Regions:
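Short amphipathic alpha-helix that is part of the acyltransferase structural core
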Residues: 1-28, 122
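Conserved acetyl-CoA pyrophosphate-binding loop and the N-cap/start of the following alpha-helix
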Residues: 74, 78-86
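A conserved beta-strand-loop-helix scaffold within acyl/acetyltransferase catalytic domains
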Residues: 29-40, 44-46, 51-69
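Residue-level recognition of the GNAT/N-acetyltransferase active site
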Residues: 71, 104
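Conserved catalytic-core motifs of GNAT/GCN5-like acyltransferases
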Residues: 102, 112, 117-130
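Conserved GNAT acetyl-CoA-binding A-motif
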Residues: 91-103
């Protein structure tokens, strides 16, 4: 496995991985130059993107882990754990002290391992349909 930090990942490779994990492709969104992250890590097996994590941040206090995707063939093999460990290490080195993540309930035990806990404040969201 090769872990690449903050190197360009093609929109097609990201979209293929999203599709493999059951998410929508978003290829045109990834091609938009405004679609950037504060930091990301990509994992490759040979030349195939098999894992990806990214976060958005103000670069000072807060970071939000936006996506953690592991190709189904590589799930349960420690790839997601390693990506989380590397991301958290990087953010701590940058002295970013509040890291948040939104996840499906069945993934709670995974995120518990990294010290995540429910926030005591309300969280709300809205979606602007096109």
């Amino acid at each position: 496995m090769i872990y690449r930090h903050n190197e360009t990942v093609s929109a097609k490779a990201l979209s293929d991985l999203r599709e493999a994990v059951g998410w929508n492709r978003m290829e045109s969104e990834y091609e938009n130059p405004l679609m950037t992250s504060y930091y990301h890590i990509a994992v490759y097996a040979k030349d195939e993107l098999v894992g990806y994590i990214d976060c958005v941040s103000n670069g000072v206090t807060d970071a939000y882990i936006q996506d953690l995707m592991i190709h189904p063939d590589y799930q349960g093999k420690g790839v997601g754990t390693e990506l989380m460990n590397q991301m958290i290490k990087y953010l701590k080195e940058k002295r970013i002290y509040m890291i948040s993540v939104v996840f499906e309930e069945n993934l709670k035990p995974f995120y518990d391992k990294f010290g995540f806990y429910p926030m005591l404040c309300g969280q709300m969201e809205t979606f602007n349909s096109k």
